[in-house]
């Protein structure tokens, strides 16, 4: 497996945790009889995940390497999260470019995506292929919410993804404190071991993002880092005002569930949603204005205020995807639109064809196409 150095370091954090979750899920369905298998087995366990790390071969951005004879591969920065890259494959005289998830040019932490190299075929993501980011400033949005909940002595619970979103919110909070937009003494807690370990990688990979040395220090020092379960439980005995960031970002699992169950029934408190909430998740239930959410087999009354930030996505929007394509010095012979909901992918296909006149296709799942 080949990846950027930062991605390799993230895998060392994420994969063992994923294996542990697989084991827990298998154990749960076995205990409750929710399986046709006898017994249900994890797809992989923590030990196997750790062993797989030996297969990783870090490759620097811009370095061309040969994974197998006859193939050349070059990674360029995609600007999405730490270590994210686009992939140029050169084989049999053809140049095939995979965009990967592309970031925003104005991202709070990440540098803009690199301009794409010349390619015969491009596969471009379309997560936001039919959407534009609103012009609201995410720092101002967050500041207004935190100032409001702090003034009434409440607790703000912020569900975050451990990689990327947690660090962006932490850095935004550090800027708000520096400007005096929120109280400098407002206690902040990052309650996610995975997010704590990921935050440390920004110091290890200073060229993989836009933060300077002071920015990295601000990122590391703005919050109390909570790792142990006992430390996490003790937060429930504290009184507001305070802010708790915890995974997961859509409230599908993790420590944030305990905080939501504890703080949702109090009208002084606030839940701040920082990104897209997929249908069927607890985050989507919170965003919908529902009065009840189910957590740990109990119906929890939602009395806390729920705020959803409108401009915090780390994905390039439709116009930014078009700008990335238009920065190519030479038009490709074929573009394939991938990695998006059907409506988003088709909207981006139409826009590419209309704007640039390039041959563009949304391939069906399982179909085969020439490059």
What does each model-found stretch correspond to?
Residues 254-263, 313-329:
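A short, acidic, amphipathic alpha-helical segment used as a generic capping/interface helix at domain edges
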Residues 294-325:
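Generic long, charged, amphipathic alpha-helical segments
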